[in-house]
From Swiss-Prot:
The keyword Ribosomal protein applies. The lineage of its organism: Bacteria, Pseudomonadati, Pseudomonadota, Alphaproteobacteria, Rickettsiales. This is Small ribosomal subunit protein uS17. It comes from the Bacteria. One of the primary rRNA binding proteins, it binds specifically to the 5'-end of 16S ribosomal RNA. One of its GO terms (molecular function) is structural constituent of ribosome. It comes from Anaplasma phagocytophilum (strain HZ). Keywords: Ribonucleoprotein, Ribosomal protein, RNA-binding, rRNA-binding.
Length: 76
């Protein structure tokens, strides 16, 4: 995967042309020496309102669309 492209799960699709996508990654905890699952939620632009809750989507960085949206949906 190239830089600026992430894969995540749609957690909220109630707004018009906007979905929330949760992106999970595994990191090594420095103190506890264990693998920990981290999550980050992105507001993503969905022009055609095609995404539904639970869909696995690929998102890409984009120029700012609004105050919180800097990502767009590439693939469903």
């Amino acid at each position: 995967m190239s830089k600026g492209v992430l894969v995540g799960v749609v957690t909220d699709a109630r707004r018009d042309k906007t979905v929330k996508v949760s992106v999970y990654r595994m990191v090594h905890h420095k103190v506890y020496k264990k693998i920990v699952k981290k999550c980050r939620v992105y507001s993503v632009h969905d022009e055609q309102n095609r995404c539904a809750r639970g869909d696995v989507v690929k998102i890409r960085e984009h120029v700012p669309i609004s105050a919180t949206k800097r990502w767009i949906v590439v693939d469903e």
